[in-house]
Amino acid sequence: MTDTPATTDLSRVHFVGIGGSGMSGLARILVSRGAVVTGSDVKKSTAVDVLRTMGAHIAIGHAAENLDLAGDKPTVVVTSFAAIPQDNPELTAAREAGIPVIRRSDLLAELMEGHRQVLLAGTHGKTSTTSMAVSALQQAGLDPSFAIGGQLNRAGTNAHGGTGDAFVAEADESDASLLRYSPYVAVITNIEPDHLDYFGTAESYYQVFDDFADRVVEGGYLVVCLEDAQAATTGERAAQRGIQVLGYGAGSAVDEDSAVPLAAEILEETVSAAGAHIRVRLALPGQAPQELSYDLHVPGHHMVLNSAAALLAGALAGGDPAELAAGLTDFTGVRRRFEYRGSERGIRVFDDYAHHPTEVSAVLNAARAKADAEGEGARVIACFQPHLYSRTMKFDAEFAQALALADAAVVLDIYGAREQPVEGITSRIITDKMPEDMPVIFEPDFSEAAGDVISLAQSGDIVLTIGAGTVTYVAGEILSELGRNNEAEEPKEPNV
């Protein structure tokens, strides 16, 4: 249980789990604003090292005395609802001392007060779309504050306290945290049942997006993807309640009878080995329509949709459309979103955070499009690690279908994260449903994963490590093993 005071004293803030992507970003912003920041985490990380260089006091391991790292006790303690158990010794000590304990989402809401909030929500694509919006707004000279779940490749950070009026952030629906915010622009990329361990039913999950739409401030906008049926329906319901709703998508893929106007229409999507050339017709309320073109260097139609959402959201937030489009051309991606890790022996290795069947399908389709555009017979090899027992049991058949888009696959055992193992449940429930004629390896031994991938791959292939857990480390191990007897090849930005 957490406390949510109307106004929180943010002069001295302690983070329990400060190394997480979401928590470390908010800690960065607080340090930049002059707050005394302390925290703890179970292990060292790059995020911890960076925060220490900025002046934060951080302990490795959780203990009650960590509340005294900076001398005086903190004025507030911040925790992540999903990752930190409520009997954590620091949380217990804080409550005994009468120190307010709040969630990360409560802190983000406090930090966004007084800003024009641009919130990106949806089952998939939040991090990529948020990152694109930030890149576009930066190019437009607006210097937005931002908090992202991943690290921008070009900026090298996941958060920033800007001088501009806009604050761009992800709106996480997994525990209804998105209902803490008051967006001027609220984007819904798509809606597909997920996090049912929290919501219980698909209907309850859908409802949280309806409630999010109702959080849009007076004069603000809800932006929805009209290619996604549930997002479009949510937009239509919101419009009936008097909310200003605008849509985006390719005209040929949108219901022409939709009550939501198509404000960012994708007119052209020309795919090449270098990425895609995009042409969009932007029709903002009260303005003459204009056509804009940009080149997108991250593959996949899902990324094209994300870029259209970012363009529309950025324009509604006050950015010049032509400058926003230039910012999308400059966008080089986000860590762990089809991230290029390197190449050895002609085998290119990419890493992606996808952990839902729809996301796995999207990233494998993007890899397939890249391979086909090169026209050199490249194959796609997937190394997948399921995330959560509950999600694996619910979507085993869908994961099998998604992985079948690859030419071959290595499937690691389940990364349980916050969940306890379920007796009799392994990743075999996925591999047993995959095509019999497809080369598939079920690998319960994590240390063997890199070798398994290498046994399947050949020069010219694209290898993808996929998942929200420790599979990201396999990408580096693959490159190390491939290059062990060769001179290491310097990783360089590929033509994606």
Curated annotation (Swiss-Prot):
InterPro entries, per this entry? Mur-like_cat_sf, Mur_ligase_C, Mur_ligase_C_dom_sf, Mur_ligase_cen, Mur_ligase_N, MurCDEF_pg_biosynth, UDP-N-AcMur_Ala_ligase_MurC
The kind of enzyme this is, by top-level EC class, is ligase
> What does the UniProt entry say about where the protein is found?
Cytoplasm
What are the annotated GO cellular component locations?
cytoplasm
User: What keyword terms does UniProt attach to this protein?
Assistant: ATP-binding, Cell cycle, Cell division, Cell shape, Cell wall biogenesis/degradation, Cytoplasm, Ligase, Nucleotide-binding, Peptidoglycan synthesis
Q: Which reaction does it catalyse?
A: UDP-N-acetyl-alpha-D-muramate + L-alanine + ATP = UDP-N-acetyl-alpha-D-muramoyl-L-alanine + ADP + phosphate + H(+)
Q: Which GO terms describe its biological process?
A: cell division; cell wall organization; peptidoglycan biosynthetic process; regulation of cell shape
Q: Which HAMAP family match?
A: MurC
Q: Which family does it belong to?
A: Belongs to the MurCDEF family.
Q: What is the recorded function of this protein according to its Swiss-Prot or TrEMBL entry?
A: Cell wall formation.
Cross-referenced PANTHER family, in alphabetical order? UDP-N-ACETYLMURAMATE--L-ALANINE LIGASE, UDP-N-ACETYLMURAMATE--L-ALANINE LIGASE-RELATED
**Protein name per Swiss-Prot or TrEMBL:** UDP-N-acetylmuramate--L-alanine ligase
Q: State the gene name recorded for this protein.
A: murC
